[in-house]
Design a protein with these regions (language model features):
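A donor-sugar binding/catalytic signature common to diverse glycosyltransferases
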Residues: 179-225
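Short beta->alpha connector loops at strand-helix junctions that form conserved
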Residues: 2-4, 196, 213-218, 235-239
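C-terminal amphipathic helix plus adjacent low-complexity
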Residues: 243-289
């Protein structure tokens, strides 16, 4: 499964509630318990309302173990890293396969020469490919940071993959490009500002790049709080210019990111293909028995 946030667990912060982190008080623990119960109640209500349609499939929302039947009872392979997760109580057959996945676009179709910016701290800025409504604010916030940090050069990608490559110099130290593949360009950057999408979140970990996360919706808040608690990223509200400025200052001021280095090494250990093969052999072996 593409995100561990969708599946219910028996403990830990529920997801899609604005980014709940590890509980620090009994009150926060109580809120998270209510969140988990509320999630389950919401699903039961929807299932009840659709009961006539679901009847033909003999659908049951939960099995005897209290686990969701929409997921396999034999094996669930989850993209992501166990080292980052705040939830606990996953089904016993849930396996982490590590962070993977990259752009399908070819890097040679998006030629951006970075050599003229060798004297700058290079900052990759993105809000992904699906948040068209957020791009104006992203450009505005980037311009504010660029004015305050002339020693940095900001590369804003608009996420228009599949189109002809375009590059516009919005300011002396702001380049706006139509699209840049993460895998090829993030390794060449010093810092990343992003929206908290799964792909860029893990690319920053893989290549050891400190990030400032400005979450916009859905599970992006959950990624942001995990990045913050793991010590690999900072976060701010997407339209709070002052908070973004302070967070970016802190990002630049930090010389050492030991947790980021540790998690970057951990990300390399995962072998998703081997895990998949192992699970296939295990399941076939169980069937033969």
């Amino acid at each position: 499964m593409a995100t561990q946030f969708a599946i219910e667990t028996t403990d830990g912060p529920p997801c899609f509630f604005g980014g709940m982190g590890s509980p620090k008080t009994s009150f926060q623990s109580g809120l998270q318990w209510l969140g988990r119960k509320g999630t389950r109640l919401g699903k039961r209500i929807v299932s009840f309302l659709l009961r006539e349609r679901l009847k033909r499939y003999d659908f049951r929302l939960y099995n005897q173990k209290g686990q969701e039947t929409i997921y396999s009872p034999y094996s669930i392979l989850g993209i992501g890293m166990k080292e980052l997760e705040l939830k606990s109580g996953f089904p016993e057959h849930y396996l982490w396969v590590g962070p993977f996945g990259s752009s399908i676009e070819r890097a040679e179709n998006y030629p951006l020469d970075l050599s003229p910016y060798a004297g700058y701290k290079k900052v990759f800025v993105s809000c992904g490919t699906q948040l068209a409504w957020a791009k104006d604010n992203l450009l505005y916030q980037t311009q504010q940071l660029a004015e305050a940090h002339p020693d940095c050069h900001f590369f804003v990608t608009l996420g228009f993959g599949g189109q002809d490559f375009q590059c516009e110099e919005l300011m002396d130290n702001v380049s706006v490009v139509s699209y840049l593949p993460y895998k090829e360009y993030i390794p060449q950057m010093d810092y990343v500002i992003h929206h908290g999408g799964a792909g860029i979140f893990y690319q920053c970990i893989i290549y050891g790049k400190p990030a400032l996360i400005l979450p916009h919706d859905y599970d992006q808040y959950d990624y942001a709080v995990r990045g913050l608690e793991a010590g690999i990223a900072l976060t701010a509200k997407r339209e709070d210019t002052e908070a973004i400025g302070r967070a970016f200052d802190e990002l630049l001021a930090r010389d050492d990111w030991p947790d980021l280095n540790r998690l970057s090494r951990a990300a390399q250990i995962y072998q998703p293909t081997e895990i998949l093969k192992s699970e296939i052999h295990r399941l076939l072996g169980d069937k033969e028995k």
